[in-house]
Regions:
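Recognition helix of helix-turn-helix/homeodomain-like DNA-binding domains
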Residues: 25-41, 63
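PLD-like (HKD) phosphodiesterase/transphosphatidyltransferase domain
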Residues: 69-146, 229-237, 244
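A short, Lys/Arg-rich alpha-helix, primarily the initiator
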Residues: 1-19, 23
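HKD (HxKxxxxD) catalytic microenvironment of the phospholipase D
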Residues: 180-219
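HKD-type phospholipase D/PLD-like phosphodiesterase module
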Residues: 141, 146-191
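DNA major-groove recognition helix of helix-turn-helix/homeodomain DNA-binding modules
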Residues: 44-59
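Key DNA-contact positions within bacterial/archaeal DNA-binding proteins
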Residues: 18, 29, 58
């Protein structure tokens, strides 16, 4: 049985068995066996490869840890929990954004509050993209039934769709940027996800409550844990179904 997750992650990052072997000091044939025979590398090699391909160890080698150990590590991935989004310190949002250098992901319906917290958000996202980070902003399709339903559930009606359209105006400067994608999605959001490299804020959603009044998890990815990776995988699934707001630019 082959490790297709490892193979795909290497291809997406332009890596080969030879290039990886040179970086971590093993024989290329050893790397080949990790792929074709699903052999599990030593912990130090798993950590190095995961960093190279920007994936979690638990995603690349799900059988490397026992269920008990994975559960224990996952608990440590929770840095803290806030009772509501409005309790998350503004400086935390700023720090996470400023420190991110590889991957920034925003999955929301509107997320208009971000531009109030961080007035230079769009300019910072463009700067990060120019420096090599992958930036993905996924907004709810303002014409979708899910956005309409969320507006009804929160008692604000059409205002939810209006929030999406207003948020989109802030992202206009990102039009046509290769590494900064602004897309629409048509999914039911059980959580809004804000990813900054290996840290993440997850705004849970509660029926009948505004997102600002719902709890937030602050997560930090750890080797051997799978909680962060579970939310990261959910983000990627939505991203795969999304479409660009400005596809021809």
């Amino acid at each position: 049985m082959s490790n297709e997750r490892l193979r795909d992650s290497m291809l997406r990052n332009g890596l080969t068995p030879t290039s990886i072997s040179e970086k971590i000091g093993v024989d290329p044939k050893t790397v080949e066996r990790w792929i074709t025979q699903d052999r599990i590398p030593y912990p130090k090699h798993r950590h190095a490869i995961a960093a190279m391909v920007r994936e979690g160890e638990s995603y690349l080698w799900p059988n490397a840890y026992s269920a008990a150990r994975t559960a224990a590590v996952a608990q440590s991935e929770v840095v803290t929990m806030y009772p509501r989004r409005s309790a998350v310190p503004g400086e935390l949002w700023r720090r996470l954004l400023d420190n991110a250098s590889m991957q920034i992901g925003i999955l929301v319906y509107g997320g208009l509050f971000l531009h109030e917290l961080i007035p230079d958000l769009t300019a910072t996202l463009i700067k990060k993209a120019n420096e090599g980070a992958q930036v993905d902003v996924l907004l709810g399709d303002p014409n979708s039934q899910h956005v309409a339903q969320r507006g009804a559930d929160e008692g604000i009606g059409d205002s939810m769709a209006a929030k999406v359209r207003n948020a989109l105006k802030f992202y206009e400067p990102m039009r046509g940027h290769d590494s900064a994608c602004v897309g629409y999605h048509d999914t039911i959001l059980y959580n809004s996800i804000y990813r900054f490299d290996d840290e993440m804020l997850v705004n849970t959603h509660l029926y009948g409550h505004h997102a600002a009044h719902a709890p937030v998890l602050h997560l930090r990815r750890l080797a051997g844990g799978d909680l962060f990776d579970t939310y990261a995988a959910s983000f990627q699934r939505v991203r795969a179904k999304s479409w660009e707001v400005w596809p021809d630019e």
